[in-house]
Amino acid sequence: FDGRNAAASDKASELMALAVRGCCSNPTCAGNNGNICG
């Protein structure tokens, strides 16, 4: 397992999580993305 890939992947999921959080706190975006915002 390549540690550098793991770090890059962690970084990407971190960014995704931030983007999802930002989207889900925006009613319009949350409404358009009910599958990720619950």
From Swiss-Prot:
MF terms (GO), sorted A to Z: acetylcholine receptor inhibitor activity; ion channel regulator activity; toxin activity
Signal peptide region: none
Tissue: Expressed by the venom duct.
Residue ranges listed under propeptide: 1-21
Residue positions, PTM Cysteine amide: C37
SS bond list: C23-C29, C24-C37
Matching Pfam families: Toxin_8 (PF07365)
Keywords: Acetylcholine receptor inhibiting toxin, Amidation, Disulfide bond, Ion channel impairing toxin, Neurotoxin, Postsynaptic neurotoxin, Secreted, Toxin
Keyword Zinc-finger: no
Subcellular location: Secreted
Family: Belongs to the conotoxin A superfamily.
Domain observations: The cysteine framework is I (CC-C-C). Alpha4/7 pattern.
Protein name as annotated: Alpha-conotoxin-like Qc1.6
Highest classification ranks of the organism: Eukaryota, Metazoa, Spiralia, Lophotrochozoa, Mollusca
